């Protein structure tokens, strides 16, 4: 089981690490921190890693947060590798040091969250 992260989040939250890969040139960035967020419809990737992978942002969308604040986000196409599974797709960019894995990926996995003990795992 993996520990929740209490350094970035209060209260502590489930944080995973992933690998991001540019599908065109094969460049990879490893150990990217990603919040596991069952309340998020979509997955968001930290913009700094997309830049390091030489990815070109394409379409722009308006996003709404849980409190209905609106923001604009561009997308990139890449491979996100999480727990040995590769998810190919178009992902939103976020300007922070961690990303968010939303239900567009989480719904393909069998996860267990143990909030009391601040642990999570894939079954």
PLM feature spans:
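Pepsin/retropepsin-fold aspartyl endopeptidases
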Residues: 1-123
